[in-house]
A protein has these predicted regions:
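Divalent metal-dependent hydrolysis catalytic cores, especially in the metallo-beta-lactamase
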Residues: 11-40, 53-66, 92-106, 120-122, ...
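Conserved phosphate-binding/catalytic loop of the ribokinase/pfkB sugar-kinase fold
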Residues: 65-90
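Short, small-residue-enriched loops and turns at beta-alpha junctions
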Residues: 33-34, 66, 72-75, 104-106, ...
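Generic structural signal for well-ordered alpha-helices
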Residues: 10, 14, 38-45, 85, ...
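Di-metal (Zn2+ and/or Mg2+/Mn2+) metal-binding site signature of metallo-dependent hydrolases
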Residues: 1-7
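Active-site-adjacent C-terminal substructures of enzyme catalytic domains
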Residues: 133-136, 140-180
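Extended, charged catalytic domains and RNA/DNA-binding interfaces, predominantly
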Residues: 87, 96-103, 108-130, 134-152
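Charged helix-capping and loop-helix junction motifs
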Residues: 8-9, 40-43, 81-83, 157-163
Length: 180
């Protein structure tokens, strides 16, 4: 779930998760204008100060491939940009724990390095990366796949893509468990 409605909405969503057995969560924020994302990040920081079940923030965007964007607004997607990332990390006050990146984009691998250097999990997702680009991202320190098999090329014997690269690297595969 994405928590873009500010601290009150985040608190309500975390309470709903708690009622269903979730003991800890990352507040996931989706692609928006950078200023709006900074505002949302600050709202998540405020909510986390009041609730120890909020373990941090996951930025699922805006550094995503347009061709694999899913529900993300294509007009808000950005090329990987270290200065924009730094704004987000500064607003997160140490709570940004994970950022999803499409590593095949120009600057994508550099963003993976910047995330790893900042102690933030770099996740590969909403990406059209082939095996080589994905493997390079995992070699650079990316260690998670954002909702495996969704928003990426399918696993194919002639084009193994992100999933095979992640398995070769021992990366964590996050899945959407709707209906489970």
């Amino acid at each position: 779930a994405s928590y873009d409605g500010g601290a009150e909405a985040i608190a309500a969503a975390v309470a709903a998760h708690r009622r269903h057995g979730t003991t800890g969560t990352l507040v996931s924020l989706i692609t928006a204008d950078p200023d709006d994302m900074v505002t949302a990040i600050r709202g998540a920081v405020a909510a986390a100060g009041d609730d120890p079940r909020i373990l941090g923030i996951h930025l699922e965007g805006p550094f995503l491939a347009e061709s694999r964007r899913g529900a993300h607004d294509p007009g808000k997607l950005l090329a990987p940009d270290g200065a924009v990332l730094q704004r987000f990390l500064d607003a997160g006050a140490g709570l940004v724990r994970m950022v999803t990146v499409a590593p095949e984009l120009p600057g994508g691998l550099g963003l993976v390095h910047a995330l790893v250097d900042a102690g933030v999990h770099a996740a590969v997702g909403h990406s059209d990366a082939g095996y080589r680009d994905a493997a390079a991202a995992f070699a650079a320190g990316a260690d998670i796949v954002t909702h495996a098999f969704n928003g990426m090329r399918p696993l194919h014997h002639r084009d193994p893509g992100i999933i095979a690269a992640a398995m070769d690297a021992g990366a964590l595969l996050e899945v959407i468990n709707d209906g489970v």
